[in-house]
Amino acid sequence: EIGIAYLATNDSRSAIAAFDRVVKEKPRSSYARKSLMKVGMAYYNNDENDKALENLKNVVAQYPNTEESREALNIISNIYRDKNEIQSYFDYIEKNNLAVISIDKQDSLSFVTIQDFYSKRDYNETLKGARQYLDKYQNGAYLLDVHYYAMKSLEGLGETEEIRQHIEYVINQPDNDYTDNALLLIARMDYDAENYSSSAEYYDRLADITENQDIMLEAIEGSMKSHYFNNEYNKSIEKANEILAINEISDNQKIQANYILAKSYFDKGDYEESLKYFNICTGLDKTEIGAESGYSSAVCIYNLQ
C-alpha cells in the first residue's frame, strides 16, 4: 500500500524501494509477486527498459502460470518491440520454453513493430526492422508493405542507393495501394537522372492507372517532357495535346504544353505548326519562355521564307 501511494504521487523511486522491501521481506507471499510486477511496471513507465526487463523476467521465472506472469510477458513483448529487437523476444520465449510462437505469429509481430516505427516517422528504426524482416521472411505475408515502408523511409532519409530495389518490388506486383507512389518516385528519379526513356515508361504507366487528378497531370507532363528530351517528338506532341484537352490545368501547365508542342514541331522541321505554338507561348508568358518563344518565332518565319 505504501508503494501504491508513492505511485499515486508519481514518486516512482520511493515506490520501487517500497516494493523491493516487500519482495525481500515476504518472498513467498502473493504480495511479493505483485510487488515485483509493480517494480517492473514502474521502471517501464519511467523508460528504464533494461531494469524493467530484468524485473519482469524475474516475475515470469519465479511465478510461472500466474496472472502477473502473463502480464509480464505482454510487457516484455512491448519492450522488445520498442527497442526494435523483436527477434530477441522470440529467442527469449524459445530459450525458456514459455510458449510456441508460430512463424505466422512471428511474421505478424515483426511487421507490427516495423509499422509502429514507420507511423512515428522513425525511418532509421523502420529500415532496421525492414531489413531484418526481409532477411528472415523471404515469403512473408507482409512483403509488399515492408518494401513500401523501406522505400518511404529511404526517401525520407534522402538515401538513393538502396531505394530502387524496394520501388521495383512494389511496381512489379499487381497494381496495389502503393503503386502510384512508387511509380511517381521512380519516374521522378529517372527524369532527374536524365534517363528519359525509363522515366517516360514509368510516367506513361502511372498516367494510365492513377485515379488522382493531380498525379495524372504530373504523370502526363512528365511523360511529355521525357519523350521530348528522348527525341520522340510524335509522343511528346501527343502528350502535350492530352494536357491541353484537360479543362482544369494551371497556367504553367498550359505554357509548358504549348512550349513542348512548339519545340517538338520545330525539331521535326514543321515550322508552320511550330510558329503557331511559339506565338501562343509569347502571349501566355512574359518571362524566359516567352522571350525565347519570341526569338524562335522569328527563326520559324525566316525558315518559312
Stretches with model-predicted labels:
Residues 1-305:
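Acidic, polar-rich low-complexity tracts and alpha-helical solenoid repeat scaffolds
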